[in-house]
């Protein structure tokens, strides 16, 4: 099935036709000056969904996510704490990887650290100087001359002639009102940089943020990538500058598909520490929410729409996951009779799967996929309530254990994309299932003493039986 993705460069949905196998995917990772906040994780979960969909559709993927461990913010933090850059960044790097695990975000194939690629960055800067697209300024920093790159502004759709140009800027982050030559190498300033610098042919200093991503991606993925993803705030200047640097170095198109997720708002306001609406994942975990609940909330909206984050939304995510958990537990009930997979159940499963996948291939429309999932759950629950398969005029077969197992297999399949379904109950060993069946047989003939003995035997194997109006459930203790 063809995959269509919205390409920021063309402003159109395009059929995904990778030029590489495996697909070369680069995503902007954290700047490790602080704990990542939920706005960051909205982007990381969108990128995780993208990767999972590619894998689900049968593509091989080689994924690189960078770690920015040298920039204005990390240097300021290290200087304030009076420690080395590595010592300052390390706790935030560890926390980031722990957060990825909590949110069920698949690991990248490589996590390059900017500080490990300084020699390659220096070499690239020298190459750009030799080509005449970079120059040493009066402040001894090295700048990229945007006038030497005719396609500058194509990604962010800027008309350079209509914008006010400044001479140059050495800040890592700036807005479109300050369009100017950007820094490739920042000359050493002892008051600003303390003891942190690298030697180079241009003098002591450190690389600019934009150059770091270009060199790490080229070093690990080559000169032409299939997909580069990030947040909309990265379009300008960061990704615009990446294109200028990378294509000046290689003289080849840098990226085929650019994908960007929209902003996350908190109570319809921009997240900021001054407004008191700034949350890290740890803040939410401390409030009693789970990683799955946070993931579900950040996952459920389309990535190109603003997502409004609220406490009510988190509680709604909790209820959605409870509904999913209850459905899965119901399917795991071992009391269903042995029988065939009924054609009506198989047809319902196939119809749902086709809708689920079709939505995903339409620019990762996860909202429609989730709507299809809950509609499917409603239909299956209704059929179980009626003690039948999906009813037709000619077939009213009893819902079977095989029906349940077929649906569970389908849910496990789609969870390769969602990464959030609460399969809380592990596989039940065959010997425990045998004891459960023996207990059910004893109960049917009202041999309560034997039924109790078998219950105790099941308990001794760390499983419990819950008898309810809708049947019996087995749970791991």
UniProtKB/Swiss-Prot annotation:
One GO term of the cellular component aspect?
A: cytoplasm
Q: What class of enzyme is it?
A: ligase
| InterPro entries, A to Z | Cys-tRNA-ligase (IPR015803), Cys-tRNA-synt_Ia_DALR (IPR015273), Cys-tRNA/MSH_ligase (IPR024909), CysS_C (IPR056411), Rossmann-like_a/b/a_fold (IPR014729), tRNA-synt_1_cat_dom (IPR032678), tRNAsynth_Ia_anticodon-bd (IPR009080)
Its recorded reaction(s) are: tRNA(Cys) + L-cysteine + ATP = L-cysteinyl-tRNA(Cys) + AMP + diphosphate
The sequence motif named 'KMSKS' region is recorded at: 270-274
Q: Which domain of life is it from?
A: Bacteria
Q: Where is this motif: 'HIGH' region?
A: 30-40
- EC code: 6.1.1.16
List UniProt keywords, sorted A-Z. Aminoacyl-tRNA synthetase, ATP-binding, Cytoplasm, Ligase, Metal-binding, Nucleotide-binding, Protein biosynthesis, Zinc
Required cofactor(s): Zn(2+)
Q: Where in the cell is it found?
A: Cytoplasm
Q: Where does the UniProt entry say this protein principally localizes?
A: cytoplasm
Q: Which GO terms describe its molecular function?
A: ATP binding; cysteine-tRNA ligase activity; zinc ion binding
Ligand binding (ATP) = 273
Residue numbers binding Zn(2+): 28, 213, 238, 242
| Entry's cofactor comment | Binds 1 zinc ion per subunit.
Cite a single GO BP annotation: cysteinyl-tRNA aminoacylation
Quaternary data: Monomer.
What is the similarity comment for this entry?
Answer: Belongs to the class-I aminoacyl-tRNA synthetase family.
Give the protein's recorded name: Cysteine--tRNA ligase
Natural source organism: Chlamydia trachomatis serovar D (strain ATCC VR-885 / DSM 19411 / UW-3/Cx)
Q: Which gene is the coding source of this polypeptide chain?
A: cysS
